[in-house]
Amino acid sequence: MILLLSLVTFVLLARAFRSLLLPLKAVALVLVSVATAWGFMTVVWQDGHGSALWGISATGSITAFVPVMVFAFLFGISMDYEVFLLARMREEYDVHGSTDAAVVAGIGSTGRLVTSAALILCLAFAALASAPEVSIKIIATGLAAGIVIDATIIRMLLVPSLISLLGRWNWWLPAGVARLLRVESSPIRIELEEEEPLVRSA
């Protein structure tokens, strides 16, 4: 299920952003957020390192449907933040053709909104963690931890860092893949290719 969902998401994002690396990075980092939330649930609830805060001893195991629920919610929430951020970066890159300018504009225009939305969700799930049902507590705390990590370390640190390091390769899409996905080439790339002979002749 995870592999199929990741593949479908990759194809849709590749078509939307006309890139191979951006959707690959997006899916990989979302899965990192999910894995972090699963690890938090295992350490706190299954192993009991912190479950005493809720007055509950270590469960020793986690019900099978709990990780599935956390994955479903967190994958959707994290991907929503990622698409929101990448859409702004892609828009800026198409205008100016600069990856660094795209990163600055993307973080500057979406950072506050993403952080505020994550804070609201985190508080909501923290309140849900007071429910008497243990499975609900595990789901709520796992989602809260995953959202905090995703909105801070992942979204505000790793995403802009990786995009800046990859530079122009963020926007690379082979012609064959572009035809397969039925998308147009980037206007910025076309302009640069047309200007290259003029630069050489000068």
Go through each PLM region and give its residues.
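Membrane-embedded transmembrane helical bundles of large multi-pass transporters/channels
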Residues: 1-202
